[in-house]
Regions:
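A structural boundary/capping signal
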Residues: 1-276
Length: 276
């Protein structure tokens, strides 16, 4: 059987430019779908690109290609944002997004980026607050696109209104919100969504798997190391909890919660003494 953590490490343990975003995103799902045929889903992405190419002349303008991309994804195949069950973890697994033709902003954006790349459009992800977007830089102008809403092109006024809806008018649009994010940041955000879902549902085993992947992606992620220690503690895996807490204090000795973690280590030592 495939080792999901080894596969994920192989997918992400390289420079940004060498990461295959589609493959890496699919490997996230291996912990939940151990028999997942990643190459089969990559082939389905390739087929979507073939269908887009068939609808557009090779010399077509960028907006023609975007129109063809939107037609194939959102009209022909019916991809759409899952507003009815937004926090279903399936929305965060790219294989399920492809299978069910629905997802959340970041997974639909990954699919959009990957299909676009295969037809020659170099789209980038945007870590817009509360709602992941993509953009295409064209002749000094950014075309901002919302795959969750069927590939709508967003003006700055649209984006300002979106922030208003998301944050009640307390957050103003800033240029930094439109900066591109790297592939590892996209994967980190995908894992962050799953982390929040499993934490809220108290699914400790799946939460532990996501934290393991997050630490593979970013070995020095101190918050993830601390949080994994807390999950281990709740699972009564005391040696692993102690190891993570000690690593956290080595990496972040002056963190605001460092004293709390030290106290947890003292409590752990007492528990281990009682067990023995």
């Amino acid at each position: 059987m495939t080792d999901p953590y080894r596969e994920f490490r192989q997918a992400v343990d390289r420079g940004e430019e060498k990461i295959d975003l589609g493959r890496a995103a699919l490997t996230i799902a291996l912990t939940d779908y151990p028999d997942l045929d990643i190459d089969a889903y990559l082939a389905r992405i390739e087929q979507l690109a073939v269908e887009v190419t068939a609808r557009c002349d090779a010399g077509g303008e960028v907006y023609q290609w975007l129109a063809a991309l939107n037609y194939v994804l959102f009209q022909q195949h019916g991809f759409c944002g899952n507003s009815d069950d937004y926090y279903d973890p399936k929305n965060s697994f790219l294989n399920e997004v492809i299978e069910r033709a629905t997802g959340i902003p970041i997974t639909l954006s990954v699919l959009y980026i990957e299909v676009a790349q295969r037809v020659g459009l170099a789209l980038e992800g945007i870590g817009f607050p509360g709602h992941f977007l993509v953009k295409l830089s064209q002749n000094g102008t950014d075309i901002v696109i919302d795959p969750f809403h069927r590939g709508e092109i967003k003006s700055r006024d649209d984006l300002a209104r979106m922030l208003g809806r998301l944050y009640g008018g307390v957050v103003e649009l800033r240029d930094e919100f439109l900066r591109p994010v790297g592939k590892k940041q996209i994967l980190k955000r995908m894992l962050g969504n799953l982390k929040a879902i499993y934490a809220n549902s108290n699914d400790l085993v799946k939460l532990l798997s996501v934290l393991d992947q997050a630490i593979i992606l970013e070995p020095g992620a101190v918050d993830e190391i601390r949080d994994r220690g807390r999950v281990y503690l709740r699972l009564e895996c005391f040696a692993q909890a102690r190891s993570d807490f000690e690593a956290y204090l080595r990496l972040a000795p002056h963190a605001t919660d460092a004293q709390q973690v030290r106290e947890q280590l003292v409590d752990l030592a007492k528990r281990v003494t009682l067990i023995h």
